[in-house]
Regions:
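Gram-negative/organellar outer-membrane beta-barrel architecture
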Residues: 2-167, 236-238
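C-terminal outer-membrane beta-barrel translocator/porin domains of Gram-negative envelope proteins
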Residues: 7, 21-31, 146-151, 155-238
Length: 238
């Protein structure tokens, strides 16, 4: 408002919009042959960080498979379906060394990495990402012949990922599915010790029968070329 002698200027500051989410989880497994594992995890997602709708996800897990992961999801424009997503990760897990289909030792594998993905949302439930990443780490003998050498490694890779999530509830879904498909190409030109390819598929499906609901899921991963068994191993269901 402007009077004869004074001017009142009001500058409104927008409030950060969006709802933050905290999730907790527990995973227990047993192979009925004396080998069991547990994991406790938590994730925190901050939404609406800036006017473009950026999100910041941080995930922590302790137990048999330890992980610290953080990712910043940044849309490229208001209402844009395109985005970039830089990330960093630290993980540690137990991996068996296999000889003639029999385990000969168990290693403790530590990996540190970072990368950048560029992607696009597909409808309201899907997205596709393409990116590059780099990781390095070491593997020390935990159980078995202590004279076996420790291993250090470097990884550099391209990756292509597709995901589709139509579950109707994050915690207790009654319908829908969660699908993920990922392909990685490890290349010496990106700093990798070896050249090889990997792909992984996951599926969780919610089925309801009257008052009862079942969630069925599966994971499958495969290394397509010759590679170091310890450092390239999958750990499914963690």
């Amino acid at each position: 408002h402007k009077g004869d002698e004074h001017t009142l200027v009001i500058r409104a500051r927008g409030k950060r919009t969006g709802t933050d989410y905290l999730r907790l989880g527990l995973n227990l497994s047993d192979d009925m042959e004396g080998d069991s594992a547990f994991n406790i995890g938590a994730s925190y997602r901050m939404n609406g960080i800036n006017r473009l709708g950026a999100e910041w996800l941080t995930r922590l897990q302790i137990g048999d498979q330890q992980e610290l992961y953080t990712e910043f999801y940044q849309p490229l424009d208001v209402g844009s379906r395109y985005f970039i997503a830089p990330y960093a990760a630290i993980e540690s897990q137990n991996v068996e060394a296999i000889l003639d289909n029999d385990p000969v030792a168990e290693y403790r594998l530590e990996r540190y990495g970072f990368g950048l993905n560029v992607g696009r949302q597909i409808g309201n439930s899907g997205e596709i990402r393409f990116g590059v990443g780099e990781a390095w780490g070491k593997a020390d003998v935990r159980i078995g012949d202590q004279s076996l050498p420790s291993e250090s490694f470097n990884e550099g890779f391209y990756q292509l990922k597709y995901s589709f999530d139509s579950l109707d509830n994050v915690y207790f879904p009654h319908a829908g599915e969660d699908i993920g498909l990922a392909f990685r190409q490890f290349e010496p030109e990106l700093g990798s010790d070896q050249r090889y390819r990997q792909w992984e598929f996951k599926l969780d499906k919610a089925l309801s029968f009257g008052p009862d609901t079942y969630v069925l899921g599966g994971r499958y991963g495969r290394t397509l070329d010759q590679a170091n068994v310890v450092t390239s191993s999958f750990l499914l269901g963690g």
